[in-house]
Amino acid sequence: MSRALLDTSVFVAREQGRPLGRPLPDEVAVSVVTVAELELGVLMAADPLTRAHRLRTLMDVKALAAALPLDERVASAYALLASTVLSAGRKPRVQDTWIAATALANGAEVWTQDADFTDFAASVPIVRL
């Protein structure tokens, strides 16, 4: 099995106590985009308790693995994925496209609880939790 790139939704689900449906693989990675989304969640928390929960999630993610960066390979993968979605007459979801592009460029599967990644299934293996 290839490495699993965990989408932001996996960490939000764990934070909220939602089941993932299966155990996570031993080899996991995260995108720097997921780190940014989780940091935004901390900054936008409506109250101190929510902020504390979100900060704990962010710290857990940072301890899990170094975030995969957005580099030239990821940029090329992003352009390919976004052009495919646009050619089909749909508007790509920017953050999800970056996460899928990170997976594509790094030979990883996207593990997610979101249905938003179906646009990329022809190019990137998607594991829906």
Regions found by a protein language model. Give the residues of each.
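Active-site neighborhoods of divalent-metal-dependent phosphate/nucleic-acid chemistry enzymes
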Residues: 65-111
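Histidine- and aromatic-rich ligand-binding microenvironments
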Residues: 7, 31, 91-93, 114
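Residue-level signal for well-ordered alpha-helical positions
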Residues: 17-18, 41-45, 81, 88, ...
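Phosphate- and divalent-cation-binding pockets in alpha/beta enzyme and binding domains
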Residues: 37, 77, 119-120
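Acidic, PIN/NYN-like endoribonuclease modules and their adjacent C-terminal/linker elements
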Residues: 100, 104-129
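Short, well-structured N-terminal submotif of metal-dependent ribonuclease cores
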Residues: 1-34, 40-59
